[in-house]
Amino acid sequence: MEGNPQSCEDPEAIKNMSLAEFINQPNVTGFHAQDSGRLRAYVESNPYVRIGTELPGGYVIGYVFEDRFEQLILELQESFVAIRPTLFTLLDRESLESASIIKVQELPAANLRGEGVLLGFVDTGIDYTHPAFLYEDGTSKIQYIWDQTIRGDSPKDMHFGSQYSQAKINEALASKNPFSVVPEQDTNGHGTFLASIAGGRENNNYIGAAPDAEIIAVKLKPASKFNLNFSAVPRGTTAVFTSDKIMLGIKFILDKADELNRPVVICIGLGTNFGGHAGRSIIEEYISHINTRRGIVIISAAGNEANARHHTGGRIPATGNSETIEVLVGENVSSFAA
């Protein structure tokens, strides 16, 4: 059953799938929504939609077959339009430097080393073999890794990806071929860069801002072709992720911090030009809710676009009126070609 897109033609076969089988179908996509009786009733009556994970604050991550997504929105109507995930990509090093994140390292008088604190990263993963994340005895300062791209021992209530504990990471480090034990790799390097800046151990005159803090890292699953095409992302664009997977990454880190009974700082080095940027999207509201909890801080660089004019605003005074907004389209953006 797993991985067979033709099973979408058989409602009975879909009903008999486990949640993990359903989620891992190649033509199933995720969405996020506020939980409600109306949504639950729709899911109960429709075999092509499942609720996967309940999140703090009354939010859920759901899954639907791609060719049923528009039907889902149409039948649940306008209050559910925001269920479609927003696309995020990586903030570059220059943006992080401009936000003064790296300058935290230059405050030795503070004498804050992060002992007893967890650092969480929702990004491209982490190179767990890097010396910046090893103690003097060669063991890892990484408590957990969740690789959303690998099938394996998925976290509780997530139903996809593979998680690795500190014990498993140490087993990998002690072996001749670490990646045969823990196959997670940060092929981009962005997540490793952020983690080393924030929590790298002292190594060759280099030291992170909180070298005694331990780490939980999430390697995000890239956005599907279905989501990229809908948002007119140019062909060949890489390192693009969806807000539903980011929200799940945050939940994973929070769950592990609760298990360890330790405070956590979660770093999200991602940004987007989609949406209103007014704090009212589902992911923004979710993060705002999480930030009210004691012992939890979520931080994100805001970018360095200044007056790049990626957003506009206006007011339509009455129903039936219209306004025209001119859009300047860059070169080689084929989705906006005339």
Describe the function of each predicted region:
Residues 1-21, 26, 34-118, 125-141:
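Autoinhibitory propeptides
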Residues 31, 321-338:
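Hydrophobic beta-strand segments within beta-rich accessory/binding domains
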Residues 48, 79, 139, 212, ...:
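A generic structural signal for alpha->beta connector loops
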Residues 85, 148, 269:
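Conserved residues at the C-terminal ends of beta-strands
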Residues 106-108, 183, 204-206, 286-287, ...:
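Generic recognition of flexible, low-complexity loop/linker segments
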Residues 108-242:
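Subtilisin-like serine protease catalytic core
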Residues 135-141, 283-284, 316-318:
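Glycine-rich, phosphate-binding/catalytic loops in enzymes
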Residues 226-316, 332-337:
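Substrate-binding/access-modulating region of protease and related hydrolase catalytic domains
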